[in-house]
Design a protein with these regions (language model features):
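Basic amphipathic alpha-helical segments that dock to polyanions
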Residues: 56-66
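Amphipathic alpha-helical interaction segments
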Residues: 20-23, 38, 55-58
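Hydrophobic alpha-helix position signal
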Residues: 7, 43-46, 63
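DNA-recognition alpha helix
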Residues: 35-48
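Short helix-capping/hinge SLiMs at alpha-helix to coil transitions
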Residues: 12, 27-31, 46-47
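Non-DNA-binding regulatory cores of transcription-related proteins
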Residues: 66-133
Length: 133
């Protein structure tokens, strides 16, 4: 019922495919990071109806627009998504392609430049790229 309400609040019809995608994303205790490709593999395991990668991308984009997930762009411009929608930052390890959450309070910025005229800052997220020592 909660999943169906989440879909409807995103202006998405609760089809079997969308319900399955939403369950993979939101029916868990822990938040997590994913790509459209890793989500595609997870929902297309044996025993489930096949869901196209296009449907995955469209549904993920709709959830992002609705504020149910966040998009994180890494330095290689790869899109990752996060079910944790609270303000926080990330470590990114390009070797493992893993993101790790950093509490928002852990990163202290001394000065943020003023935005261009007619614009305001909507959000600020820091992605710290890692490498081996």
């Amino acid at each position: 019922k909660e999943i169906i309400n989440k879909l409807r609040s995103s202006n998405l019809r609760p089809t079997k495919q969308r319900i399955l995608i939403a369950k993979k994303l939101f029916d868990r205790k822990e938040t997590f990071h994913f790509t459209a490709e890793t989500l595609n593999k997870a929902v297309n395991k044996k025993g489930h109806a096949r869901i196209s990668l296009g449907t995955i991308y469209n549904t993920v984009e709709a959830f992002k627009r609705a504020g149910h997930i966040r998009e994180i762009l890494t330095n290689n411009s790869k899109s990752y998504y996060d079910t944790n929608i609270k303000s926080h930052h990330h470590f990114y390890d390009p070797g493992t392609k893993k993101l790790t959450d950093i509490d928002y309070q852990e990163v202290i910025l001394k000065k943020i430049p003023n935005p261009p005229k007619g614009k305001k800052i909507k959000d600020l997220e820091v992605v710290i790229s890692l490498q081996k020592k």
